[in-house]
Amino acid sequence: MTDRENQESPNKDNVTGDSISKYRIMVVDDNKDILRMLKMGLEGSGFSIDAYSDPFTVLSVFKTIYGNKTETPIRMPYDLLLIDVKMPELNGVELTKEIKKLAANANVTPPPICFITAFDEYYEILRDLFPNNKHDPDICLIHKPIEIENLTTRLKHEIALHK
């Protein structure tokens, strides 16, 4: 997309043609510099971003979301989760497993999840996430280093797949 096309149709999603400003993404990374870069870059691309550096805070957010025991269906506020794999105390894989447990207990589907990972962690993640080679289509892997333009395209694609 050229600069002129961006000016004529700001925040247009090439995948669906919809405005991406309606898409809300939770970004989780313990490295505050990377978190800030991702937040600024993705917001600059038109996404609404909630950024967290502490995975335990993220768990609290999801406990609140999935703890809604009213008659009304749970409204998931996030279209996608972007989670770093390597975090101290609670890594991205463990965080994802906890979020999926909370969702299962609430009888809802969690949002799609994209992991940010260094290439050498790839097979370790696959082994931990997909035991017995049972693939989870709601999870994608994004390799470092990250280029915001490529990341934006990938996230729009992942969101479109799950709409």
Residue ranges with predicted function:
Residues L35, P88, E121:
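The feature encodes the CheY-like receiver
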Residues V28-D29, Y52, L81:
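Conserved sequence signature across two-component system core domains
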